[in-house]
């Protein structure tokens, strides 16, 4: 959605066709119910600053990088609102404070060191640290309600957001579909990708009728979430050799009790649980979804072999295994047994056990106020790194062929939050001529004023 809209603004003469397997748009991991909507800015996610160094400090370079990238997303979306590409911004972004919360003496010292490192940078100058329960109760009363004695601490920054990535995606795609030379086709699955002398032949099957057609394109972008890896493998490009995918399912606890929901106005991230992947670090989130304020806790990870929540099949993982990635996937199983056991345990635990995890954040939680829902599926990119197979990559990665005729996005966190920065990477690499001209540069500056600046 972001790439199509940005390319069309850079060069209105471009013809752009989008295909979506689902009947609706942005129904998988982008949908508001299928992700945390944090607007990852590095403010509260402790997994980006996982440990203290030998001198007691905490490295904050990663959170600074993510914050800068998310600023680019907000700039582009602001441009979209101002230029009638996305109306009613409160339908997709709302201000919500971001809080990091820890308990235990060691973690309190860690958070204090994290705050010292982050608040020294101008991005996070407004961040506040406290160990005072009265102060914390004024920030997020559910965290203190019913809590026993013991060291606790939190940081808070009011500049955080809650983002409905599905809503902004659908708004941008709606605008794109109305532009000359552009089309949006949902209910269409790509079943073939073959290189030709001028670019690519894309075979597409319409789900409702079974009709198959072939389109030709000079450039193809694969941004299909968990469905990206099979399409990338289908392309046959050398850059896809050895790549694998490791799907991780997700579930939320959701509370619609208005009395409880109104007590909480923050996104609260906690400490990573043992063996948990980064996208499964627990958090208690205020969400604005479908015009309604609600409260989500999770995510709880789960074992799955599907690559997509709605359009996926249980054969996705086995069918993705090829001779060139078999050793990588085997090594994932061997060297990440704790992770595999964790996923199986998470997916089979009882509601009582889930509520016990929730009580780490909200000690007074009652099971009757919460229900379990399924969330999206994250497919982690797996590849060989430094000669060692079986490394799970929890970030996002753009794979581009040598001819710059096809790009694909793999990975998850921080994902949608830095989508505009990812789009910039694709444009710089695959469409350099669009930025080389004075006119193109000016158009990009209008969309993202800091795109060529280092604001760190």
Predicted regions and their residues:
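Glycine-rich FAD pyrophosphate-binding loop
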Residues: 8-32
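Dinucleotide-binding Rossmann-like beta1-alpha1 core, especially the glycine-rich loop
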Residues: 37-138, 294, 304-306, 312-315
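Central beta-strand plus flanking loop segment that forms part of the substrate or channel wall
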Residues: 41-43, 239-267
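Short beta-strand to alpha-helix junction loop
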Residues: 61, 65-73, 102-109, 155-177, ...
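Flavin (FAD/FMN) cofactor-binding and adjacent substrate-gating region
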Residues: 87-96, 101-179, 183-185, 193-198, ...
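C-terminal catalytic lobe of FAD-dependent flavoproteins
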Residues: 150-159, 167, 309-436
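Core beta-strand elements of the Rossmann-like FAD/NAD(P) dinucleotide-binding domain
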Residues: 208-219
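Flavin (primarily FAD) binding-site architecture
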Residues: 222-238
């Amino acid at each position: 959605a972001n790439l199509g809209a940005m390319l069309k603004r850079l060069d209105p003469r471009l013809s752009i066709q989008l295909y979506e397997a689902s009947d609706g748009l942005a129904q998988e991991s982008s949908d508001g119910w299928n992700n945390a909507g944090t607007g990852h800015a590095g403010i509260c996610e402790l997994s980006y600053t996982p440990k203290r160094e030998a001198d007691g400090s905490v490295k904050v370079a990663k959170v600074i990088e993510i914050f800068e990238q998310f600023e680019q997303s907000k700039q582009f979306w602001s441009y979209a609102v101002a230029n009638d590409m996305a109306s009613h911004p409160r339908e997709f972004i709302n201000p919500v404070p971001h809080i990091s919360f820890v308990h235990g003496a060691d973690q309190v010292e860690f958070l204090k060191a994290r705050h010292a490192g982050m608040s020294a940078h101008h991005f996070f100058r407004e961040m506040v640290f406290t160990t005072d329960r009265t102060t914390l109760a004024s920030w997020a009363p559910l965290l203190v309600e019913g809590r026993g004695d013991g060291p606790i601490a939190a940081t808070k920054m009011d500049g955080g957001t809650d983002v409905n990535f599905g809503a902004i995606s659908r708004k941008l795609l709606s605008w794109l579909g109305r532009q000359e030379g552009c089309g949006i086709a949902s209910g269409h699955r790509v079943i073939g990708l073959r290189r030709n002398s001028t670019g690519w032949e894309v075979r597409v099957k319409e789900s409702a009728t079974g009709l198959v057609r072939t389109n030709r394109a000079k450039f193809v972008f694969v941004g299909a979430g968990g469905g990206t890896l099979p399409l990338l493998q289908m392309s046959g490009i050398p850059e896809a050799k050895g790549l694998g995918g490791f799907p991780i399912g997700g579930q939320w606890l959701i509370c619609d009790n208005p009395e409880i929901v109104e007590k909480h106005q923050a996104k609260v991230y906690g400490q990573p649980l043992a063996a948990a992947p980064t996208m499964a670090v627990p958090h208690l989130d205020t969400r604005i979804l479908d015009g309604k304020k609600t409260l989500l806790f999770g995510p709880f990870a789960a074992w799955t072999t599907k690559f997509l929540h709605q359009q996926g099949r249980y054969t996705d993982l086995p069918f993705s295994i090829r001779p060139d990635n078999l050793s990588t996937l085997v090594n994932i199983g061997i060297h990440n047994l704790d992770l595999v056991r964790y996923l199986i345990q998470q997916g089979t635990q009882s509601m009582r056990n889930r509520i016990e995890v929730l009580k780490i954040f909200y000690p007074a939680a009652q099971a009757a106020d919460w229900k379990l829902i399924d969330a999206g599926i994250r497919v982690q990119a797996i590849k060989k790194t430094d000669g060692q197979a079986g490394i799970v990559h929890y970030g996002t990665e753009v794979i581009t062929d040598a001819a710059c005729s096809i790009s694909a996005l793999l990975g998850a966190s921080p994902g949608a939050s830095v989508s505009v920065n990812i789009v910039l990477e694709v444009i710089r690499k695959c469409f350099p001529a669009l930025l080389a001209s004075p006119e193109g540069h000016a158009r990009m500056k209008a969309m993202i004023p800091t795109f060529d600046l280092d604001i760190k």
